[in-house]
Amino acid sequence: MMSYAEKPEDITRDEWMEKLNNVHIQRADMNRLIMNYLVTEGFKEAAEKFRMESGIEPSVDLDSLDERIKIREMVLKGQIQEAIALINSLHPELLDTNRYLYFHLQQQHLIELIRLRETEAALEFAQTQLAEQGEESRECLTEMERTLALLAFDNPEESPFGDLLNMMQRQKVWSEVNQAVLDYENRESTPKLAKLLKLLLWAQNELDQKKVKYPKMTDLSKGTIEDPK
């Protein structure tokens, strides 16, 4: 028997993969994780198709996703004012109680004005709608200044702040809106699959902190596992 003072033997990648292959996961459990992800992220059409293929019933009425889907489409198209109006119609108090979310939506509208090269409208909007929040929050002020800095460049997409004009920026705002709406409705706002991935990263970090050598998953999207280092 190994004492606590002894160092455990290093495990190779092949040995690790063999152990993983011996772990059995029920297909139904995997399907429930997939359905949970689709519902939480608002992918109604995919959830309906997956229900037919897997026989797994969603935890909510899929028709309840319709309003969130409309909001997502608006945000991802850059129609921020329309999205704000729909959010206010759906949950009138949400943006009043979540001022940081409201700021991010307003900031995104400013970004869309800059994208369209509507400089005067962008400056006026920043002064009338965002300046007060910038005075109240240093973090908001920093983000507003970073956004307005786009105006200093002939090609803002190629500037040091060009990431604000990427599609990922709209996606980031939508994710924040989606989580806020689900939280407001007292519904699960983070997919169980995301929680499991976070648990995996936490466990690997704990092993790293203890200087344990083990086959590490280095790419979550591909499931890439590298040899111990």
From Swiss-Prot:
It is found in: Cytoplasm; Nucleus. Pfam families: CTLH, LisH. This is Glucose-induced degradation protein 8-B homolog. It comes from the Eukaryota. Disruption phenotype: Morpholino knockdown produces morphants which exhibit loss or reduction of dorsal embryonic structures and Wnt signaling deficiency. Coiled coil: none annotated. InterPro entries: CRA_dom, CTLH/CRA, CTLH_C, LisH, Ubq-SigPath_Reg. Keywords: Cytoplasm, Developmental protein, Nucleus, Wnt signaling pathway. Its main location: cytoplasm. Residues 64-121 form the CTLH domain. Residues 26-58 form the LisH domain. PANTHER family: RAN BINDING PROTEIN 9-RELATED. Core component of the CTLH E3 ubiquitin-protein ligase complex that selectively accepts ubiquitin from UBE2H and mediates ubiquitination and subsequent proteasomal degradation of target proteins. Acts as a positive regulator of Wnt signaling pathway by promoting beta-catenin (CTNNB1) nuclear accumulation. Required for normal Wnt signaling and normal dorsoventral patterning during embryogenesis. PROSITE patterns: CTLH, LISH. It comes from Danio rerio. Identified in the CTLH complex that contains at least MAEA, RMND5A (or alternatively its paralog RMND5B), GID8, WDR26, and RANBP9 and/or RANBP10. Interacts with CTNNB1. One of its GO terms (cellular component) is nucleus. The keyword Flavoprotein does not apply. Disulfide bonds: none annotated.
